[in-house]
């Protein structure tokens, strides 16, 4: 039933979602991923096969779920103004939760850095740790992220003004900038002289920057999907909730990275 047909019988503007298997499948695949990862890390299972299987099921089911959401928004007209307001509110709460997670990681970092224990040698970084220099890859990544914030803003404003060509160009450049950031971060990790198991410094460093790295991988995927949708005329100047939330997400990650760079790379060294 299309939105126009439903409006004759429905006295409220909200979308009644049809029965879907994806929420329960995603939930169980997330549970399976967490359990298999914990079992593999503690040596209860000898390989990562269950982890990769759970990750494959999670990725596949999430992709199919978002496919249905795109169909409801683009082709069925189910995302009314009231629904879009609800989506924006939900995304805002998601951003708040992300900020609180990183606030906890910064707290852990400052707790260890401002009063290093005797076991750490009484200094920060601890004795034996060769910290990543802030003027090398981290500085390049900072410049890349600031540039991506500018290009995605240019693309967003071009879309609002109906300039599809510039919107596509800006989004294409932004997507590749984020991909380059992810590659540079991976190179930094592979060349670092310490690991996540090297005491509290390694743990909190990789917990903070690694969580941001995973979010950047997810952001690159979101940008690529929005580029595909924009090329296929899914997004208009007045209806582009998915793209708008992605832009906000990028700016939030930009700000978090600036704090990570200042605290973890510059002040912490």
From Swiss-Prot:
Keywords: Membrane, Mitochondrion, Mitochondrion inner membrane, Translocase, Transmembrane, Transmembrane helix. PROSITE patterns: COX3 (PS50253). The chain crosses the membrane at residues 21-41, 45-65, 90-110, 138-160, 167-187, 205-225, 247-267. Its main location: mitochondrion. Its EC number is 7.1.1.9. The keyword Translocase applies. InterPro entries: Cyt_c/ubiquinol_Oxase_su3, Cyt_c_oxase_su3_dom, Cyt_c_oxidase-like_su3, Cyt_c_oxidase_su3-like_sf, Cyt_c_oxidase_su3_a-hlx. One of its GO terms (molecular function) is cytochrome-c oxidase activity. One of its GO terms (biological process) is mitochondrial electron transport, cytochrome c to oxygen. GO terms for cellular component: mitochondrial inner membrane. It is found in: Mitochondrion inner membrane. The keyword Chaperone does not apply. It catalyses: 4 Fe(II)-[cytochrome c] + O2 + 8 H(+)(in) = 4 Fe(III)-[cytochrome c] + 2 H2O + 4 H(+)(out). It is a multi-pass membrane protein. It holds the Pfam family COX3. It is an enzyme of class 7 (translocase). Component of the cytochrome c oxidase, the last enzyme in the mitochondrial electron transport chain which drives oxidative phosphorylation. The respiratory chain contains 3 multisubunit complexes succinate dehydrogenase (complex II, CII), ubiquinol-cytochrome c oxidoreductase (cytochrome b-c1 complex, complex III, CIII) and cytochrome c oxidase (complex IV, CIV), that cooperate to transfer electrons derived from NADH and succinate to molecular oxygen, creating an electrochemical gradient over the inner membrane that drives transmembrane transport and the ATP synthase. Belongs to the cytochrome c oxidase subunit 3 family. Component of the cytochrome c oxidase (complex IV, CIV), a multisubunit enzyme composed of a catalytic core of 3 subunits and several supernumerary subunits. The complex exists as a monomer or a dimer and forms supercomplexes (SCs) in the inner mitochondrial membrane with ubiquinol-cytochrome c oxidoreductase (cytochrome b-c1 complex, complex III, CIII). This is Cytochrome c oxidase subunit 3. The lineage of its organism: Eukaryota, Fungi, Dikarya, Ascomycota, Saccharomycotina. The gene is COX3.
